[in-house]
Amino acid sequence: PSVPKVKRFFQEMHFLSLLKELPLDIVALKKNYCLVNDLESLEQLLKKLEKETKICIDTETTHVHPMLAQLVGIGFGIQPGHAWYVSLNGFLSKEVILEKIKPLLEKKEMGFVGHNIKYDLHVLKNENISLQSIHFDTILASYLLHPNTQRHSLDELSLQRLGREKIPIESLIGKGKKQISMLDVPLDLIKDYCCEDVDCTLQLKEQLETEL
C-alpha cells in the first residue's frame, strides 16, 4: 500500500508510535518562522497583527504551572506556515515589550486562538494583561470531538492529524538532573519551538473547526 494510505490508517487508528516511523510530508516542512528581537521588527509585527481579527498565540515560560511560571516569550501567527516569536529575554526589556503588546492583547474585537489557551491566559494575567476574547481552543475542540481518549496534547494531535513530529521540549531543556531553564535556551531554538506550536495550532484549528 502507498504511504498516504498507510498514514491515513495509522491516523484513524491512533497508532502514534507507528506514525513516527513514516516519512514526513515535504509540504509540512515548508515554514517561515521569524524571531522578533528589536524595536523595529516588533513595531512592524504589531502593525501587521492589528489589521487582523483573529490571532493565534502561544506563551513560552519556565514552568508548567502558570502561577509558578516566568514568561520567556510569546509566539504569534495568523495563518499556517508563518509565525513570529517575540523574545522577552533578548535585547529589548520585558517591560518595554509588554507595554507595546498589551493594547493588542486586550483589544476586545480581537479573537485569540490557542492550544490550552487557559494556560496562556493565566500567564499573561500574571503580567497584568487580560485577553478579552477567546475565539478557539484546539485542546477543547479535540476533547469535544473525541471525549473517550486522553490524547489531546499538541504533540499527539500534530502527529495524529498532521503527520508531523514536533520538536520535543527535552531537546531544548533536557530532563532529569541535567534539565535547564527556558531562560538559558538559545533564542533560535526557542523561536523554532514556539513558532512550530503556533503553526501546528493554526493547522489543527482549520481541521477541528470544520468537524465541530
Spell out what each predicted region is.
Residues 2-74, 88-104:
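Long, highly charged low-complexity segments
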Residues 65, 69-212:
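Active-site-proximal helix-loop-helix substrate-binding element of RNase H-like nuclease domains
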Residues 1-2, 149:
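Short acidic alpha-helix initiation/capping motifs at coil-to-helix transition points
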